[in-house]
Amino acid sequence: MERVYNFSAGPAVLPVPVLEKVQRELLSYNGSGMSVMELSHRSELFQNILDDAESLIRELMEIPENYKVLFLQGGASLQFDMVPMNLANGKKAAYVNTGSWAKKAISEAKKIQGVEVEVIASSEDRNFSYIPEIPTVSSDAAYLHVTTNNTIEGTAMFDVPDSAVPVVADMSSNILSSVYDVKKFGLIYAGAQKNIGPAGLTLVIVREDLIGQVEGLPSMLDFKVQAENDSMYNTPPTFAIYVAKLVFEWIKEQGGVAGIEALNRKKAALLYNYIDQSDFFSSPVEPSARSLTNVPFVTNSAEFDKAFVQEAEANGFKNLKGHRSVGGMRASLYNAFPIEGVEALIAFMEKFANARKGGEVRV
């Protein structure tokens, strides 16, 4: 079956070689006569998968030994609660508000009893079209929470501020797509369904000294319990971890995160350059803050936007509709998205624009 160009913001496109390997191994993994989905999580076969996945992500992100790597469940949304529960410890928590997901993290932290949330910077005044300057964080704060890529609004934070307190980062939509120095962070978390693998897995990278600060937490929500049990306090998402391991292998073959970032910059530059020179399409994001992985764009008409999404869908360009909260279009160019798809999209955009410059709307 012919593949389409899938611009979904998540779950998102996976590398074809990974999907092909999953297909080959689906009925019998490693000659076992069992699918990965059927393996006991306590078996040697799965333990090897888990160990390999951790080893690979440590290599790809250059994770120091004094950080734990956890393969959890509940999505990044559960980390909105786990982070303040485990790290706040009666102190103030500083947050930067750069978009919809940051707002949700802030909202959830405020629900945790005993946690005082301070929003120290925000770009909401201009519809989250830029990354705000982050002031010095008080040393009596428990942590500083940032969102490195704002999936809905299409902005990214590439320069992480130096901070006297641990920096916590939601990297869900640009982990492994840009190089970050893990040592600058106290904790990194990311839902898997954009650059890592299938939905259902959450990656957490946490510095050891931040674990076990709060006693009496529910076991499933306690980083200490999860770390002491090597991500297997309960049955982990075994199939998602297996696919993640294959994706990590694929990234390594592409030249690691640095190689992936170079390709991502080429893909994003192609699309942004076309949008910027177009007199039909435009970007709502300030150039200095533009994401490499999520590219929103609009026409000057909601009717044209609707027509574009419908015709794009009919021509094999799937999931280009912008998030319901912002409208317009959004092209998500995650690691596995091919540069040929960007080139094909640009050609389609040019054709669409030329046909509409006289004011015609075709649906």
From Swiss-Prot:
Cytoplasm is among the record's keywords: yes
Q: What class of enzyme is it?
A: transferase
Q: Name one GO cellular component term.
A: cytoplasm
Identify residues that carry N6-(pyridoxal phosphate)lysine.
194
Q: Where in the cell is it found?
A: Cytoplasm
> What biological-process GO terms show up in the record?
L-serine biosynthetic process; pyridoxine biosynthetic process
Spell out the coiled coil positions from the record.
none
- Associated pathway: Amino-acid biosynthesis; L-serine biosynthesis; L-serine from 3-phospho-D-glycerate: step 2/3
What molecular function does GO assign, one term? pyridoxal phosphate binding
EC number(s) stated in the UniProt entry for this protein: 2.6.1.52
Q: Give the protein's function.
A: Catalyzes the reversible conversion of 3-phosphohydroxypyruvate to phosphoserine and of 3-hydroxy-2-oxo-4-phosphonooxybutanoate to phosphohydroxythreonine.
Name of protein: Phosphoserine aminotransferase
Instruction: Print the organism lineage.
Output: Bacteria, Bacillati, Bacillota, Bacilli, Bacillales
Q: Which gene encodes it?
A: serC
